Regions:
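Short, conserved charged micro-motifs
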Residues: 90-97, 209-212, 369-371
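Conserved nucleotidyltransferase catalytic core and NTase-mimicking acidic/glycine-rich helix/loop elements
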Residues: 165-348
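N-terminal regions immediately upstream of nucleotidyltransferase
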Residues: 15-76, 92-94, 119, 133-139, ...
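Conserved catalytic core of two-metal-ion nucleotidyltransferases
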Residues: 97-141, 336, 344-357
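Extended, charged low-complexity segments
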Residues: 347-433
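Internal, well-ordered alpha/beta segment that forms a basic, Gly-enriched binding/recognition surface
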Residues: 126-180, 205
């Protein structure tokens, strides 16, 4: 039970004190739940170092990376440890697979396709992510984003060394975003990467400050490389400015570490963080599954259509499969909007395993939309338009218009024609089936 020690006086002061105590108690309890024990950290480091020693015997240099190296690891059912294998030249990377196949590994080896292929060594409750990187002293000359990963580790470790308490604050941010489906730079999630959360929490000075501050600032330059937000927007590649948030990489000023963050994911994050700040609870750190029942009830209340879709693909499970299916789902959502179907709620659900995913929507369906045709003064085009559209045409504001019959089902049938191009298939899951 929470006690308000010394919080007497006006009601609003008492309320504020209660909030502060509640937040502290929640975070204290959550830290106990997500902190990896010293013994477990030692065990994980042992697994990683044994593997690195095996690589060294074969002439390869490797380092521990990721959350384990930075001291920001949180409890998970299956831990993943980044192992960066450093090469002098990109051509040398090709020999890594041959070496790994000849080694006696602590688990099953799996090739994972990405911007640069890497490897998983599945050891049961631990997965070693073996990532080849090319050593470089100038991030601007890096051939691949993974080549600057070691500089990310050095930056975060340096900040944690200056302020050891910030490591726990970063853990809160990772656990919170993971629970609320906002964590992961994978294409099917389009959430915060672990590194972006580390930068943001360090910049704002804590987890709670991050949740509050991110609502007020969407262009962030931690190292103050640029004189103004306008200069940032001018200097960074336009392709890196499409998302809702611009965060300049402290290790390379021309990179936006939040370039992959999706608008829908960010909006959901803002919504849930606002609720948490108003009423702190451990429930916000529990994995949020898609509330199908709630979506159905919402659809009923709004007199809208609830839609459940199943996606399949033949692409490699994980990021590639998930991204293909998510891209197809987002294409369908865009086509619904083009046809003036009111998309009220959207959820995509892929576990990261397998080649199936689900999409859920609540849509306020329209049966008819008005489509503008040629100007009344353009006689030849107008005649062709009227002949082609029949009795559905009418005049309005100097143009011919056409009443087009539309529906969610028609849009779904239309997008099915793109299955081969999208690399995924879709079908509607009917209620009770």
């Amino acid at each position: 039970m929470l006690r308000l020690v010394g919080c007497f006086g006006k009601f609003n002061k008492v309320g504020f004190c209660f909030f502060v105590m509640a937040m502290k108690e929640v975070l204290k309890s959550e830290l106990e739940l997500i902190s990896v024990s010293d013994e477990e950290v030692s065990r994980l480091e042992g697994v990683a170092l044994d593997f690195i020693k095996s690589l060294k015997k074969r002439g390869l240099t490797a380092y521990i990376g990721g959350s384990l190296a930075k001291g920001t690891l949180i409890v998970k059912e299956k831990q993943d440890i980044d192992i960066f294998v450093v090469f002098d030249y990109s051509e040398d990377i090709l020999k890594l697979e041959k070496i790994l196949k000849k080694m006696k590994l602590p688990g099953e080896l799996k090739l994972v396709h990405g911007s640069r292929d890497y490897f998983h060594v599945d050891c049961g409750d631990v997965v070693l992510e073996v990532v080849p990187v090319v050593e470089n002293k100038d991030p601007e000359l890096a051939e691949n984003v993974t080549d600057v990963s070691l500089s990310h580790v050095r930056y975060v470790k340096g900040e944690v060394l200056k302020n050891p308490k910030i490591a726990d604050e970063i853990k809160f941010a990772k656990a919170f975003c993971r629970a609320n489906r906002c964590y992961g730079a994978e294409g099917y999630i389009r959430g915060f990467s672990g590194y972006s959360l580390e930068i943001l929490v360090i910049y704002f000075g804590g987890f709670e400050k991050f949740l509050k501050g991110i609502r007020k600032k969407n262009v962030i330059d931690p190292m103050k490389y640029f004189k103004s937000d306008r200069e940032i927007m001018r200097e960074l590649n336009a392709n890196k400015l499409q998302g809702p948030l611009v965060v300049v990489d402290p290790t390379y000023k021309f990179r936006n570490v939040c370039a992959g963050l999706g608008l829908l994911t960010f909006e959901k994050f803002l919504e849930v963080s606002e609720k948490f700040l108003k009423s702190p609870s451990l429930d916000f750190f529990k994995r949020r599954e898609v509330d199908v029942k709630g979506m159905k009830e919402f659809a009923l209340k709004k007199k809208a259509k609830f839609l459940e879709l199943e996606f399949r693909t033949d692409r490699q499970e994980g990021d590639i499969a998930g991204t293909k299916m998510n891209k197809f789902f987002r294409f369908f959502v865009k086509e619904l909007a083009k046809n003036e179907q009111g998309v009220l709620r959207v959820e995509f659900d892929y576990s990261g395993v397998g080649k199936k995913a689900k999409g859920y929507l609540v849509v306020l369906e329209k049966n008819e939309v008005e489509v503008c045709g040629p100007s009344i003064g353009l006689e030849e085009q107008a005649v062709k338009f009227c002949e082609g559209k029949g009795n559905a045409v009418f005049k309005k504001k100097g143009f011919w218009w056409w009443r087009k019959r539309v529906s969610v089902d028609r849009v779904l049938e239309f997008v099915k024609g793109f299955e081969k191009e999208m690399g995924a298939m879709v079908r509607e899951v009917k209620s009770g089936k």
